[in-house]
């Protein structure tokens, strides 16, 4: 699955050619893609690359990426030469179960056999899941049950297929796939650090007209409506 993600990033670069390349965490593919499509209709040459933020930052170091949409806290810990941030909204950690399997509270996770989570080192919501497990006092009980996967899209795939009993994802995917899950439980925000999603401007953005248009676009009412629709407010 990781190999497929890397291939998708490479394909975006090849396909993009001289186009502006914007990277984003895989859990934000849907809203960022909608924003990109609106810009394309306006004549802006722009493409997106999507994977967990760890993989995106590796790609960004090659200098081909102009901006990254992701967790500010995560990006600030990287050694990328970030020139500034444009705040988009706030995300949330959500627990979901497959259709047909219902739970009412996170305490019931102790009764489940397998729970998927994004990579704790490379993915935004893997970091937040780890924080939640520690702060809730559930870490010791749930550690043997946890199945780490690349990122939010992979957790969603495991949950929907019924290969796991539950999974931790972001509010964006929870909203986008409404009706495809059994239970949808928003985790108490006091149990993990805030998730502020921003567009980080990289050196390739400076003096780039297309990048300036992208940054301006995410501030427009139509883009704010898109992000709000996918749970970013």
What does each model-found stretch correspond to?
Residues 16-41, 49, 54-233:
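Exported/periplasmic ABC-transporter solute-binding proteins
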Residues 46:
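Hydrophobic anchor at the start of a short beta-strand
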Residues 1-2, 178:
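Generic cytosolic/nucleocytoplasmic N-terminal low-complexity/intrinsically disordered segments
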Residues 3-12:
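Sec-dependent N-terminal signal peptides
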């Amino acid at each position: 699955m990781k190999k497929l993600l890397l291939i998708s990033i490479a394909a975006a670069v090849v396909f993009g050619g001289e186009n502006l390349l914007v990277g984003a965490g895989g859990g934000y593919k849907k809203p960022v893609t909608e924003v990109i499509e609106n810009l394309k209709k306006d004549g802006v040459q722009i493409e997106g690359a999507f994977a967990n933020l760890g993989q995106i930052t590796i790609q960004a170091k090659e200098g081909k990426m102009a901006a990254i949409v992701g967790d500010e806290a995560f990006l600030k810990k990287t050694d990328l030469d970030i020139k500034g941030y444009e705040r988009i909204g706030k995300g949330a950690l959500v627990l979901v179960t497959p259709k047909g399997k219902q739970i009412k509270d996170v305490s019931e996770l102790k009764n489940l056999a397998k729970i998927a989570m994004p990579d704790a080192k490379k993915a935004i919501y893997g970091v937040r899941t780890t924080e939640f497990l520690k702060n809730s006092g559930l870490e010791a009980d749930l550690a043997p049950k946890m199945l780490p996967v690349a990122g939010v899209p992979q957790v969603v795939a495991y949950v929907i297929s019924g290969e796991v009993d539950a999974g931790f994802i972001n509010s964006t995917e929870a909203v986008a796939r409404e009706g495809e899950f059994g239970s949808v439980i928003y985790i108490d925000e006091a149990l993990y650090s805030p998730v502020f999603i921003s567009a980080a401007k990289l050196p390739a953005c400076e003096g780039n007209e297309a990048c300036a248009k992208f940054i301006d676009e995410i501030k427009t009412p139509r883009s704010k409506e898109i992000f709000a629709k996918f749970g970013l407010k």
